[in-house]
């Protein structure tokens, strides 16, 4: 689908459809008022008859509006003008895209980007419109024998900005939005793959393909033999019960040739299937444990964004691929593992495996002398209990980094919420037999998992994103969400000096 930006008046647009907003109760937006004036009150007369109230989610398609060059005018309900926020704005864009596809409009000019959204500029509105539109059009049908295709799919969308002076900002918003949308799609495609296809070797193949197709990107893969030499015993233990080899894929992007420039490292938990191991999970919903690699899928998607935008920074993405299965060789509750860092861990529950994979990976990345490290993981059900499906959990040992990530989450509309790492929580992961235990009980489970990881991240500035509640949806709309690709992409754009205020 093609996106463009322009500046012009609605009555002069020759298009299959132009899109304008209507507020509650039956109040025309400024652009809709222009069309109403040109059409001698045609639109306002329809509203007075009760054709459209203006509530969010409502729409009305008009054909051959008098004195308007476009074939059709689509009125979209925007709710109450003073209450229009970013969440409603995205809902409005979703409704617009779905309606256009239902009506068979192949191209359209959208004036909704001129609506006033609290605290948001035109760059944000255009970029969010692009990301939301691409998300609406996403399908995962690679494995279906009968693919359903729209008869007349939407092919082109033009966003209008108020003045020509804002065209460069709009064009930049489209470029950024398309790159991030592409990264989100890559993340979702990888996460939605079934575990009989997507194992650690598949993650490695995707990493290699990215290096082959992108400038400034290289990839290397660490297998089990090298992990043994590195004493990555916690990582190795998790995969012992599986016939699929554990593989750690390292994607390195070099956008800054300055030898003094230290890399930003992203570590993604890549449990391509998590049965729970010996501490096996309930059968109900276990199919969704293919999504336990959404951290790795996120890192892969973000590396795609970085490579596409050719950001002038150095970024290393690590996909910590593994599979947790029961079996005669599987690790057990009661085992004590010596991690790569030398710290020992008592295994109380084999279903608390993600932190065991991550702890050795966090030690491994010390060799890159990173500027900072962010790990992304579907780590705990406790985070879902705390924050639901709306916010990712954020923990950090460095306040400025936490503030940067929170700011990026606000900018991107990909929300996170910071949780504490207090000393009291560390007491919950003490062990009678080892340096620490791999679980700290039910209470504060998301935080004790973060505390566990923090014990392996003391040599650099570190943040942890628990995406267990935000990485995928269950139910009828089951599927990966692509979060938090947008948050991390915004963080890296800010780091590269390419934020929305540029």
From Swiss-Prot:
GO terms for biological process: proteolysis. Pfam families: Peptidase_M17, Peptidase_M17_N. Mn(2+) 2 binds at residues 269, 274, 292, 353. It is found in: Cytoplasm. Binds 2 manganese ions per subunit. GO terms for molecular function: manganese ion binding; metalloaminopeptidase activity. Its main location: cytoplasm. One of its GO terms (cellular component) is cytoplasm. PROSITE patterns: CYTOSOL_AP (PS00631). Mn(2+) 1 binds at residues 274, 351, 353. Gene3D superfamilies: Leucine Aminopeptidase, subunit E, domain 1 (3.40.220.10), Zn peptidases (3.40.630.10). SUPFAM superfamilies: Macro domain-like (SSF52949), Zn-dependent exopeptidases (SSF53187). It catalyses: Release of an N-terminal amino acid, Xaa-|-Yaa-, in which Xaa is preferably Leu, but may be other amino acids including Pro although not Arg or Lys, and Yaa may be Pro. Amino acid amides and methyl esters are also readily hydrolyzed, but rates on arylamides are exceedingly low; Release of an N-terminal amino acid, preferentially leucine, but not glutamic or aspartic acids. Keywords: Aminopeptidase, Cytoplasm, Hydrolase, Manganese, Metal-binding, Protease. Its EC number is 3.4.11.1, 3.4.11.10. The active site is at residues 281, 355. Its cofactor is Mn(2+). The keyword Protease applies. The keyword Hydrolase applies. Presumably involved in the processing and regular turnover of intracellular proteins. Catalyzes the removal of unsubstituted N-terminal amino acids from various peptides. Belongs to the peptidase M17 family. PANTHER family: CYTOSOL AMINOPEPTIDASE, LEUCINE AMINOPEPTIDASE-RELATED. This is Probable cytosol aminopeptidase. The gene is pepA.
